[in-house]
């Protein structure tokens, strides 16, 4: 019984890691933090259909939201 629980836990962690890794490697999902002005630094863009809206006017950081 203990082995089965351990395998389930490992499976869940692997899936979560894959999902998080996928989100960070390609694009930011809705509600995730993003950078409005990168100043030439490498940043992760928002996913297709989303735009980076700043928290307040002039802010460098924002959150990915639908157009």
Swiss-Prot record:
This is Tachystatin-A2. GO terms for biological process: defense response to bacterium; defense response to fungus; killing of cells of another organism. GO terms for molecular function: potassium channel regulator activity; toxin activity. It is found in: Secreted. The keyword Secreted applies. The presence of a 'disulfide through disulfide knot' structurally defines this protein as a knottin. Exhibits stronger antimicrobial activity against the Gram-positive bacteria (S.aureus (IC(50)=4.2 ug/ml)) and fungi (C.albicans (IC(50)=3.0 ug/ml) and P.pastoris (IC(50)=0.5 ug/ml)) than Gram-negative bacteria (E.coli (IC(50)=25 ug/ml)). Binds to chitin (8.4 uM are required to obtain 50% of binding). Does not cause hemolysis on sheep erythrocytes. Has no blocking activity on the P-type calcium channel. Has also been shown to weakly inhibit Kv1.2/KCNA2 voltage-gated potassium channels and TRPV1 receptors. SUPFAM superfamilies: omega toxin-like. It comes from Tachypleus tridentatus (Japanese horseshoe crab). InterPro entries: Antimicrobial_tachystatin_A (IPR022717). GO terms for cellular component: extracellular region. Residues 1-23 form the signal peptide. Disulfide bonds join 27-47, 34-52, 46-64. It comes from the Eukaryota. Keywords: Antibiotic, Antimicrobial, Disulfide bond, Fungicide, Ion channel impairing toxin, Knottin, Potassium channel impairing toxin, Secreted, Signal, Toxin, Voltage-gated potassium channel impairing toxin. The record marks 32 as: May be important for binding to chitin. Granular hemocytes, small secretory granules.
């Amino acid at each position: 019984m203990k082995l089965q629980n351990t395998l389930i836990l490992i499976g869940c962690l692997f899936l979560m890691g894959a999902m998080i890794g996928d989100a960070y490697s390609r694009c930011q999902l809705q509600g995730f933090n993003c950078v409005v002005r990168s100043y030439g630094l490498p940043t992760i863009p928002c996913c297709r259909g989303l735009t980076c809206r700043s928290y307040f006017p002039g802010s460098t950081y924002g959150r990915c939201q639908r157009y």
